[in-house]
Amino acid sequence: MLINNSSANAKYNMVLNEKKISPSKTNCNLQWLKGALTPMLLDTETKFCDIECKFTIEAETEDEFEFKFSELNKEIIECVLKFDDINRLYKCYIQSVKEPVRITPYNWEFTCNWIGYKFSNEIIVKIKKEDSKNIKVRGNLKTPAMVEITPSIDLIDLVINGLANDPITIKNLHANKKIIIDGKEGTVTEECINKFKDTDLWEFPFLNPGINKISLSKNSCDVVVKYEPRYL
């Protein structure tokens, strides 16, 4: 098992005994009109899954255990978990850590509970001086996207369709200066400087599962789209 891409066993002399992972919770907004034979599904909202893990830490002394346990508690407040038998990652936020129980002179057992969401490794799609491209998105949930735009010439504006419900317009683009629209962080920068004032958008970039058709108003840019597939 990996915690933040480091082996839990190597770092804390810790083994995973048991894990329970729930499906992500989905809230359905339903309306059943008077006289209708079936309800109408208006929209859905997907939220966290629950993750429970039972661990054992081995230590020579109680003092050594307390040090390891303290360091672990700090690391798992917000973390990424990777289980050996699941080809998926879990972004997690701690909810509780139960009091450790000493089960042998050298072993302590405890349980951690997180909420989180499921995703897989980042996928990078390049659009090199083209005005359109179809992106087949893995996973089964909508996911935020990061868009990097590097124009080869100065441009008055660039309009991008297919990365949100409405077009995204960027103005005053400069040759060879990279603009990044980050759908996860909610930022727009040019060479690390805020460029939100030159951007017209109603929502930050995202991709839906399946085929997403991306179109650009000009073909003089190199565009990179990055996303992490998400799962229920």
Language-model regions, residue ranges each:
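Short polybasic amphipathic segments
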Residues: 1-5, 12-14, 79-82, 157-160, ...
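Intrinsically disordered, low-complexity segments enriched in serine, threonine, and glycine
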Residues: 120-232
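Short amphipathic beta-strand/extended segments with alternating polar/hydrophobic composition
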Residues: 10-15, 89-96, 167-174, 197-200
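Polar/acidic, low-complexity leader/linker segments enriched in S/T/G and N/D
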Residues: 1-32
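Generic beta-strand structural signal
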Residues: 79, 108-112, 143-145
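Short, acidic/charged, Gly/Pro-enriched secondary-structure junctions
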Residues: 4-7, 56-97
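Short, charged interaction patches at domain edges and termini
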Residues: 34-36, 96-129
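Oligomerization/assembly interface segments of phage tail-like spikes and tubes
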Residues: 38-63, 105-119, 212
